[in-house]
Amino acid sequence: MKVVVSIGGSVLAPDLDADRVADYADAIQSLDAQGHTLGTVVGGGPTARDYIGSARDLGANEIELDQLGIAVTRLNGRLLIAALDDRAAPTPAESYDEGREAIRRGDIPVLGGIVAAQTTDAVAAAFAEYVGADLLVYATSVPGVYNADPNEDDDATRFDELGADELVDVIADIEMDAGSSAPVDLLAAKIIQRSGIRTMVLDGTDPERVVRAVEDGEFDGSEILPEA
């Protein structure tokens, strides 16, 4: 099975912990050893937010802030590449073409951000569509998709399953509420809707959950199903 795994920066590198990165590399290598074709996308997490906040205070514009965030995602990507050793492409892919070429060579590509004004959520969805992935997995700090931001609304309820059309509606509603955040952004949701790729959103703080989700289809989170 061809699988793209999106690893949130808050999951992979909330701080510099080599053991956490090594555990994620072990999970990716385990899936690779089972014969799956893999691509990975890594987010920026709190480090990116810290840099962006400081740069904003210094007067950087939004495109400059995006470029700074992209640079941090690629630093996180290099940590994962170091842990994956010779199974990974040697540097983070800076385009979808580079990522696909790595897969064709038999390497595991690691992508961070690609272009300004696009999150790594959207990069993962677009890359999954580009390479014809069978499954897209978002390993996040939130255990699934909720009907509201669970950090803002104590009554938020999680979807075990939802269609891609419903995902777009839910994310659009959440993003309209100031201060709220969703496990994937609206552009990513729309790409998932367009592509028809089966998608899982799960709590990725334990990388073994990603392995079980891919191998057994067993996970505690939300599954987004293609529309008929």
UniProtKB/Swiss-Prot annotation:
ATP binds at G9, S10, G45, R49, T140, Y146, D149. It is found in: Cytoplasm. It holds the Pfam family AA_kinase. CDD domains: AAK_UMPK-PyrH-Pf. It is an enzyme of class 2 (transferase). One of its GO terms (cellular component) is cytoplasm. Pathway: Pyrimidine metabolism; CTP biosynthesis via de novo pathway; UDP from UMP (UMPK route): step 1/1. SUPFAM superfamilies: Carbamate kinase-like. Catalyzes the reversible phosphorylation of UMP to UDP. This is Uridylate kinase. It comes from Haloarcula marismortui (strain ATCC 43049 / DSM 3752 / JCM 8966 / VKM B-1809) (Halobacterium marismortui). The lineage of its organism: Archaea, Methanobacteriati, Methanobacteriota, Stenosarchaea group, Halobacteria.
